[in-house]
Each structure stands twice: as C-alpha cells, then as structure tokens.
From Swiss-Prot:
Residues bearing the modification N-acetylalanine: A2
Subcellular location: Virion
The family this protein is said to belong to: Belongs to the high plain virus capsid family.
Protein name per UniProt: Capsid protein
Species in which this protein is naturally found: High plains virus (isolate Utah 96)
Primary localization: virion
Record key words, sorted: Acetylation, Capsid protein, Virion
Amino acid sequence: MALSFKNSSGVLKAKTLKDGFVTSSDIETTVHDFSYEKPDLSSVDGFSLKSLLSSDGWHIVVAYQSVTNSERLNNNKKNNKTQRFKLFTFDIIVIPGLKPNKSKNVVSYNRFMALCIGMICYHKKWKVFNWSNKRYEDNKNTINFNEDDDFMNKLAMSAGFSKEHKYHWFYSTGFEYTFDIFPAEVIAMSLFRWSHRVELKIKYEHESDLVAPMVRQVTKRGNISDVMDIVGKDIIAKKYEEIVKDRSSIGIGTKYNDILDEFKDIFNKIDSSSLDSTIKNCFNKIDGE
C-alpha cells in the first residue's frame, strides 16, 4: 500500500506502509544519521560589572571622556565599528550588537557605557548594593581624580540634569546594566523615564519598551516582586525623589512661559519711540489672555 505525505513544499510519497510503519529508505531524507554535538559554551556570559570595577589600574579619565563623547561613540557603533578603550591595565573591546560571551573584556556598547557609569559613580562615592547582606554599603574605591571642567554628559543635560545634579553621569545609555551594583537607582531611573516619556520625547513603539531593559536585569535576580522587596521599595522611592529633585524642567510649556516673562521685561525697557505697532499688538494679546 502506497502513501502520500503533503507539506508546504509539495508531496512526499512512500512506496509501502506495513503495520503502520514506513520504511525509511522509501522516503528521501535530506538529513540523516544524526550525530550529537556538545552545546556551544560561548553563550555563557562572562561579563561582571562588579568584578571589572575591582580591577587595578583605573584610567578613569577615559570613562569621563567616553560619556562626554558618547554621541560620537554611538555613531561608531551604528556604523558597525569595533572600538577599543584603555579603562584598566587591559583593554575593553566594544563590538556592536555583541551577544553575551565567555570573555570578560569584550563587551557590547551598552555594557561598555555601564562600565563607564559605574567607574564614575564609584569615583563620586556612591554606595553599592550588597546582595548577600541586602543593603547598600560604602564602595572601597580610593582613586584621587579631579575631572576636567570640559567633561559633561550632554544627554543628561538635555534631560534637565545639570553637572551639579547627582544623576548627571548616571543618565546615560546603558545605565540599566549597572543593576547589580545600583539596583534601586536603575529601577527609579526607569520609572522616571517612563513617567516623563512625553517631556523627554523618548521614541518607542510600546510603553513596555521603556522598561524592558530594566526588567531583564531584574528577572536575572529572581521574581520581580521578590527582587523589589529585597532592594526595598522605600529605598527606590527615595532614589526617585533624588532624581527629580533640583532637575530643570524641560517641558516646552514651562520654557514658553519663562521666555514670555523675559520678553515682557525687555519690552518694558525699550524706548517708546522704538516700539512699532507689531510688537505692541503682540504684547497686547498676551496681556489680554
């Protein structure tokens, strides 16, 4: 008894069917005699931010320079350029679109930026979360360095974080990857970006995209609710308060009102002989609103 098997590409025919079984030689197979291969262990993730930050020979100036020039470095990434940085006594090699691997010093762009953020925050004496003790502790970094006045985080400035603001250097691409050492800060900053997404003009397809990087880091530590409890929701709330405190509003409405006040002050200082009808009408409309 012959038998036909239909699939998306056509029909396969077997000559005989005996007791419900087809003889393998009756159907042409593309892959046969399967041979087992051991799993590729290159997928093991060797990256550890905390371990790298315990390395000797910090070149912290490179971290400040990298965040300052992050726009140029990001363009290099977009152009698929591999980059190398001397952050320690060994090089950090940055490969665009890199997947997790066994190497400790070959990283993706976002992880490299997280490393720079971590170095700077260590230098700024931020406390580090100890997962074993479930609390924040002093970091033991003793590096003595005064950053150049020219160093700045342009992305943070555009979001209202001045150079004096505690989170000026933290608000950068890849901050989510500092979760192992700054979990409350990462969660609070993700909450800030989500809640201020319109003001910050963040582009996204779905709201979940705004917190997805943070969620991936949280779930590495366990159940979301449990991790939140370990870190401490009260602590997360305090970190959020720190983020929004003394931040300059960048809302267009606020800035529009501010500039109108300045315009009115200037208007009052202009000699009446220089005031044409156009500018008078403009200010009459403003005062009449």
